[in-house]
Regions:
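Conserved phosphate/pyrophosphate-binding and hydrolysis machinery centered on Walker-type P-loop NTPases
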Residues: 8, 36-44, 71-72, 84-87, ...
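Interdomain "pre-motor" coupling segment immediately N-terminal to P-loop NTPase/helicase cores
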Residues: 20-74
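N-terminal pre-Walker A segment at the start of P-loop NTPase domains
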Residues: 76-100
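Conserved P-loop
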Residues: 91-167, 214-217
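Walker B motif beta-strand of ABC-family P-loop ATPases
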Residues: 170
Length: 248
């Protein structure tokens, strides 16, 4: 057997020996630090490249995985969105929305307008952009979220469900106001909003202005409490409207 072939075979065996325990062992920083104490510059350069490659691989896998976990009903993007029917608040520009800067606050966003004006498209597109930036997102219709919470509560799994929702940095609650919510559903939806305080952004799409949310929840006090959580305790309550157009 030629020397080059033998060396290659020996290298392959050594790589297999390294990979077997690597699949079972999480990285321990102290062990790594101890080994780096006696590492040569070349060895340290190798470890540095390895660490960065591992981080890049994990981030790429996360960005690929997040859109599927979010629960988007369709693949909508900002590139093909028509902004001409959107009326932004006087103190807020479109760039503030497209940049996802509201996630840094965190701030809530309310998209208000008649059915069929592109609110859901925009909410999905923002959520998908957030996913591509490594931000965990969850998408629900208001009715679907309430049903999910009610079922979890009945099965004694409410805490687990709320913990799952809390893992997202951005929550989209679509079609708020299309279906009335009873007292128990209102209480559970308020719990989601309360848990999100100062840690998550909620994007609402609705056909009812925030002042009329009492009709949706069947409880004006509960509706007011949700509005207070978003508009007073958070830095900004972003409510902007859509006008009906033949395009949608």
């Amino acid at each position: 057997m030629p020397d080059a072939t033998r060396r290659r075979a020996s290298t392959n065996r050594k790589m297999d020996e390294i990979m077997r325990p690597a699949r079972r062992l999480p990285l321990t920083r102290q062990v790594l630090a101890d080994q780096l104490e006696t590492a040569t510059p070349a060895q340290m350069e190798f470890v540095d490249r390895w660490m960065n490659a591992e981080i890049e691989s994990r981030e790429a896998s996360k960005r690929t995985r997040l859109p599927g976990q979010a629960g988007f009903p369709a693949a909508k993007e900002l590139d093909d969105y028509d902004w001409q029917n959107v009326r932004m608040p006087a103190d807020w520009q479109r760039s503030g929305l497209e940049s996802l800067g509201f996630l840094d606050g965190p701030e809530d966003v309310v998209m208000f307008g008649p059915p069929g004006t592109g609110k859901t498209h925009l909410a999905i597109a923002l959520g998908r952009k957030a996913c591509r930036q490594g931000v965990p997102v969850r998408f629900y219709t208001a009715a679907g979220l309430v049903m999910r919470l009610l079922r979890a509560n009945t099965e004694g799994k409410l805490d687990r469900e709320l913990q799952a929702i809390a893992k997202a940095r951005m929550i989209v609650i679509d079609e708020l106001g299309y279906v009335p919510i009873d007292e128990e559903g209102s209480r559970l939806l308020f719990q989601v909003a309360a848990n999100a305080y100062e840690t998550q952004s909620i994007v609402y799409t609705t056909n009812i202005e925030s002042g009329g949310w009492g009709r949706v929840f069947g409880d004006p006090n509960m509706a007011a409490a949700i509005c207070v959580l978003s508009s007073c305790y958070r830095p900004v309550w972003r409510e902007f409207s859509f006008r009906k157009s033949g395009r949608f």
